Structure formats: structure tokens, C-alpha cells
């Protein structure tokens, strides 16, 4: 059996007619329209807005405005300036493990990022997760190279 656009039908009971309130007892929702006898919730102009607590100071105004939420998916780096790399020998391949072994870094928790503060006088091959533009320039000026890893 092929389905054609003109033969499509909605499921039984999925499309109910809107209940017309206040149109007599025989209509099923006459008189008080299912809102009860008296009170704010039975009056016209109902319902009250979301968060309304009957005149009491609402929760969203009682609680202080929260600031300084942590940035979601923020990348944290172990940072190291170019000037600290002068302690290494010429032609060394620099990575996180070597820096810990040489005592330049202690207990790094995050990937390595090289910053461009200071002067570099040694030719190195630096492997890091990130470089600033000035750090990359200083490493390449001396004849070294920058390698990215994740």
C-alpha cells in the first residue's frame, strides 16, 4: 500500500476540540468553568505569572545575584616563558617530560603553552600544545622550530 498525501490522517484522539468554558451547564464547563468557587485563581485575568508567590518576595529576588561562574570548556595550560628555555643545551628537543626532568617545571597538570616573555639565545625544537605569536617568532628567529601536539 502506498501512502499518498491526501490519504494521511491524524491518530484517533490526538486532536481534541477546544473546551469552550462558561457556555452553560450542558456544555460541561459552565458556571464556574472548572475553576472552583472563589479566590484569585477563579477570577478573570488569571493565571498569575510564573514565579508569583502571592505577594511574598519571590525566590528569584530573595537569592543574591550570582557572579563569577566558571567558564565552561575552558582550556587550562601550564605556561612557560621563552627566557626559561635558555637553561637547556643547544639543539635539544623540548617537551613536557624533559622540562620536568631538568627541573624547570614541577608537577605539571595541564598541557604546555609557551609564552614570549624574555629573550631566547639557544636553538631548540619545542613541542607544546600552544604557542603565543611572539614566542613562536622568538624561537624561529634563533633557528629553532615549533611543533604542536594535542
Curated annotation (Swiss-Prot):
PANTHER family: 50S RIBOSOMAL PROTEIN L15, LARGE RIBOSOMAL SUBUNIT PROTEIN UL15M. One of its GO terms (cellular component) is cytosolic large ribosomal subunit. The gene is rplO. It comes from Prochlorococcus marinus (strain NATL2A). Binds to the 23S rRNA. Belongs to the universal ribosomal protein uL15 family. Residues 1-57 are annotated as: Disordered. It comes from the Bacteria. InterPro entries: Ribosomal_uL15 (IPR030878), Ribosomal_uL15/eL18 (IPR021131), Ribosomal_uL15/eL18_sf (IPR036227), Ribosomal_uL15_bac-type (IPR005749), Ribosomal_uL15_CS (IPR001196). One of its GO terms (biological process) is translation. GO terms for molecular function: rRNA binding; structural constituent of ribosome. Part of the 50S ribosomal subunit. Residues 25-37 have a biased composition (Gly residues). This is Large ribosomal subunit protein uL15. PROSITE patterns: RIBOSOMAL_L15. SUPFAM superfamilies: Ribosomal proteins L15p and L18e. Keywords: Ribonucleoprotein, Ribosomal protein, RNA-binding, rRNA-binding. Residues 13-23 have a biased composition (Basic residues).
Amino acid at each position: 500500500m502506498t501512502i499518498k498525501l491526501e490519504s494521511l490522517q491524524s491518530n484517533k484522539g490526538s486532536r481534541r476540540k477546544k473546551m469552550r468554558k462558561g457556555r452553560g451547564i450542558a456544555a460541561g464547563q459552565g458556571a464556574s468553568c472548572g475553576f472552583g468557587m472563589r479566590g484569585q485563581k477563579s477570577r478573570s485575568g488569571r493565571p498569575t505569572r510564573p514565579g508569583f508567590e502571592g505577594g511574598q518576595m519571590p525566590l528569584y529576588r530573595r537569592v543574591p545575584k550570582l557572579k563569577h561562574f566558571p567558564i565552561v570548556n575552558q582550556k587550562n595550560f601550564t605556561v612557560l616563558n621563552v627566557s626559561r628555555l635558555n637553561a637547556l643545551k643547544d639543539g635539544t628537543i623540548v617537551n613536557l617530560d624533559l622540562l620536568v626532568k631538568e627541573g624547570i617545571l614541577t608537577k605539571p597538570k595541564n598541557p604546555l603553552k609557551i609564552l614570549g616573555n624574555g629573550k631566547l639565545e639557544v636553538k631548540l625544537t619545542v613541542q607544546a600544545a600552544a604557542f603565543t605569536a611572539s614566542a613562536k617568532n622568538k624561537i624561529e628567529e634563533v633557528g629553532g622550530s615549533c611543533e604542536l601536539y594535542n
